[in-house]
A protein has these predicted regions:
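Short, compact, well-ordered microdomains
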Residues: 40-62
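N-terminal non-globular leader segments, chiefly Sec-dependent signal peptides
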Residues: 1-39
Length: 62
């Protein structure tokens, strides 16, 4: 299992982990956010959230 915290400044590191399942950052109310494609559809990733990749490569947000 891999865990990576999104800081708002580490998009390239997140992109390496998530590949094409992550969309480029966008800004909302002064905060950086990402959209992540999971098995349940797109999920927002906010600064401070953790992206988790399980042993089968499935992604989720905590």
């Amino acid at each position: 299992m891999k865990r990576l915290q999104y800081t708002g400044l580490n998009y390239e590191e997140v992109k390496q982990m998530c590949g094409d399942k992550i969309l480029a950052p966008y800004f909302c109310l002064g905060f950086s956010m990402l959209s992540l494609m999971t098995e349940d559809g797109f999920v927002s990733v906010n600064e401070g959230d953790y992206i988790v990749q399980d042993e089968k490569g499935r992604l989720s947000v905590e």
